[in-house]
């Protein structure tokens, strides 16, 4: 499988070279930054601008924490967090991704305009989500694997074959989308790394080592989001998420070396610099 373009709203994102998705968290309980960018829209917008300057190709904006044990956030609160930021960045002329699992939030954002990608940790399982996206002509979609819900997904997760189970799940979700009329070139897949998505350390390592097989089995490009997650903390011994930059960059490079086309990261400059050197040296990890 060698697909070189991701149809994402107003953009055709080339996948011949790895792309960086910069994370803009608007959640006060974010595991990675403690909610520092959720204080007000201007703080979040300044952060988004900085990510673009540092080399982000895509901005991913989200208003609901999906960390392990995250508390419930109402749709009204989620929309109140993301709407003022989405309204502003929609006119920036860069690919904008909305990180949400709720159909009602997707619908409001798409009506607002300027939203190119729906990045859904629940793989469009919310009622009406597939049908809503099927009615859109070009909106890009990222379908992610998650076991359970954010509040409970790390309570005794079980897999017999994590790579096979993730592949089968994502194949089934993408097949449902295509059957509903969503063009395959609009779809990209995310295996869902981290304890926050129902996978302990050994399962995350297995998934990372078998990314080529996962991509071959599903037939779609991959987006990898492992930045600052507990997996990195467990491997490095770093309890503070903000101090997991070096491990996160290493994981991003390993992802790209194994075929991932997009990496979703908090630390854009460090990742962009590492990718520049890696590409220039032609390293095959």
UniProtKB/Swiss-Prot annotation:
Effect on the protein upon substituting residue 188 to T: In strain: BT490 / Serogroup B / Serotype 15, 952 / Serogroup B / Serotype NT and 3976 / Serogroup B / Serotype NT
Mutagenesis or variant effect for residue 137 to T: In strain: BT490 / Serogroup B / Serotype 15
Similarity remark: Belongs to the DHPS family.
Gene encoding the protein: folP
Any one GO biological process: folic acid biosynthetic process
Protein name per UniProt: Dihydropteroate synthase
Matching Gene3D superfamilies: Dihydropteroate synthase-like
InterPro entries xref list: DHP_synth-like, DHP_synth_dom, Dihydropteroate_synth-like_sf, Pterin-binding_dom
Positions of (7,8-dihydropterin-6-yl)methyl diphosphate binding: 66, 99, 119, 190, 229, 264-266
Outcome recorded upon mutating residue 206 to T: In strain: 3976 / Serogroup B / Serotype NT
Effect listed in the UniProt record for changing residue 245 to G: In strain: 3976 / Serogroup B / Serotype NT
Species of the source: Neisseria meningitidis serogroup B (strain ATCC BAA-335 / MC58)
Outcome of mutating residue 69 to C: In strain: BT490 / Serogroup B / Serotype 15
Pfam families, per the entry: Pterin_bind
Keyword entries, A-Z: Folate biosynthesis, Magnesium, Metal-binding, Transferase
Consequence the record notes for mutating residue 135 to C: In strain: 3976 / Serogroup B / Serotype NT
Phenotypic consequence of residue 253 to V: In strain: BT490 / Serogroup B / Serotype 15
Domain Pterin-binding: 18-276
Stated consequence of mutating residue 147 to R: In strain: BT490 / Serogroup B / Serotype 15
